[in-house]
């Protein structure tokens, strides 16, 4: 124990400069560690067009639809739809845990389908996975009685998940600062076409794929169709009500833009040709004036007009005086003639 004292005193002596100049370094190191830890714990939510994200939720939908109990005879195979995912993203940006008010409106949530279905999930952002959200919807089957088609609670998400006629799905997850009592929340929305209802059972029970269409084939216990399942990329379509709306120039917009550029070029060429053929048709001094020059020019014009008016007045006065003199001369001559006649 006694041998450790010099070491302790030496350590304290070396730590004195640290107390003076190294406190700031320690604070900066602590801040860096906090930032590093937060960055490691932070999760980045996937984009709605991320391929891995799309494959995850589409495959899980088909897996759960193909594994329904009782077995389904007419459930369709689901594929991704970009317009539905854009609608999910647009509504998710509002950070409202309420259903989209445009689902039944024509071309408001999809350029082709109307009567769109929608499932929603809200939870902490750092806990989100597509699997957790979709399986929470599937868990609602516990509240659904397939025999009489009734729910003991809210099972609308499950019904839409296994709705037989739905074959297109598009999902998106959006971060929100707060939804309800959840801070740093994530809202996950999936849209379906055609959408389901609560008016009947979600599918027809029976041996899988026995009630598929004529041109359908059985894929993973579901009815697939190459034409129906073909992906359509709606390049220029976005929800009209999305704010802020993405800037998109469709073919008509591109045509008008090119037409304006062409007209501008033709106008410039025409002006250059006219100026080359008639060099004096436009004089720069006559076409371009500064405000001071224009005011000075106006004053000069007014002065010139006043001079002209004065000159005209003077000319008129001179003419009147000349006429008066001529009359007086004529009168004098007439009087002289009369006098001469009288003398004779």
From Swiss-Prot:
Share an example GO biological-process annotation for this protein.
Answer: sexual reproduction
Q: Which UniProt keywords apply?
A: Membrane, Transmembrane, Transmembrane helix
Where does the UniProt entry say this protein principally localizes? Answer: membrane
Q: Which SUPFAM superfamilies match?
A: PR-1-like
Task: Cite a single Pfam family from the UniProt record.
Answer: CAP
**Keyword Transmembrane listed:** yes
Where the record annotates domain SCP, the positions are: 58-192
Q: Which CDD domains match?
A: CAP_GLIPR1-like (cd05385)
Residue ranges for the region (Disordered) are 292-344
SMART domains registered for this protein in UniProt: SCP
Q: Where is the composition biased (Acidic residues)?
A: 292-304, 312-334
What domain of life is recorded for the organism? Answer: Eukaryota
Q: Where are the transmembrane segments?
A: 254-274
Expression is induced as follows: Up-regulated by doxycycline.
Q: Where is the composition biased (Basic and acidic residues)?
A: 335-344
Give a brief account of the tissues where this protein occurs: Highly expressed in testis. Detected in prostate, kidney, bladder, lung and bone marrow.
Which Gene Ontology CC terms are recorded? Answer: extracellular space; membrane
- Where does it live in the cell? Membrane
State the membrane topology.
Single-pass membrane protein
The family note in this entry says: Belongs to the CRISP family.
UniProt name for this protein: GLIPR1-like protein 2
Q: What is the lineage of its organism?
A: Eukaryota, Metazoa, Chordata, Craniata, Vertebrata
What's the name of its gene? Answer: GLIPR1L2
């Amino acid at each position: 124990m006694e041998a450790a004292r010099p070491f302790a005193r030496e350590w304290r002596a070396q730590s004195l400069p640290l107390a003076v100049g190294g406190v700031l370094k320690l604070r900066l190191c602590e801040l860096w560690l906090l930032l590093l830890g937060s960055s490691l714990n932070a999760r980045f939510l996937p984009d709605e067009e991320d391929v891995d994200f799309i494959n995850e939720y589409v495959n899980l939908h088909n897996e759960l639809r193909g594994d329904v109990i009782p077995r389904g005879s007419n459930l369709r195979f689901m594929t991704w739809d970009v317009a539905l995912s854009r609608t999910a993203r647009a509504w998710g940006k509002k950070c409202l845990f309420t259903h989209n008010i445009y689902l039944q409106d024509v071309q408001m949530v999809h350029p082709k389908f109307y009567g769109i279905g929608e499932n929603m999930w809200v939870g902490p952002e750092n806990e989100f996975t597509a699997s957790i959200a979709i399986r929470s919807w599937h868990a609602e089957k516990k509240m659904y009685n397939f025999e009489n088609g009734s729910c003991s609670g809210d099972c609308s998400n499950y019904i839409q998940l296994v709705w037989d006629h739905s074959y297109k799905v598009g999902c998106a997850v959006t971060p929100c600062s707060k939804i309800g009592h959840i801070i740093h929340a994530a809202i996950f929305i999936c849209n379906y076409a055609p959408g389901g209802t609560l008016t009947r059972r979600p599918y027809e029970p029976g041996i899988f794929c026995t009630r598929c269409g004529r041109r359908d084939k059985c894929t993973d216990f579901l009815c697939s169709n190459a034409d129906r399942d073909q992906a359509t990329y709606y390049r220029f379509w976005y929800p009209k009500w999305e704010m802020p709306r993405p800037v998109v120039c469709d073919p008509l917009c591109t045509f008008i833009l090119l037409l304006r550029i062409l007209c501008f070029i033709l106008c410039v060429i025409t002006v250059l040709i006219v100026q080359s053929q008639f060099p004096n048709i436009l004089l720069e001094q006559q076409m371009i004036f500064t405000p001071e020059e224009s005011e000075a020019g106006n004053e000069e014009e007014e002065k010139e007009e006043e001079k002209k008016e004065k000159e005209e007045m003077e000319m008129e006065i001179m003419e009147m005086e000349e006429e008066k003199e001529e009359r007086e001369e004529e009168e004098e001559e007439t009087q002289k003639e009369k006098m001469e006649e009288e003398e004779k």
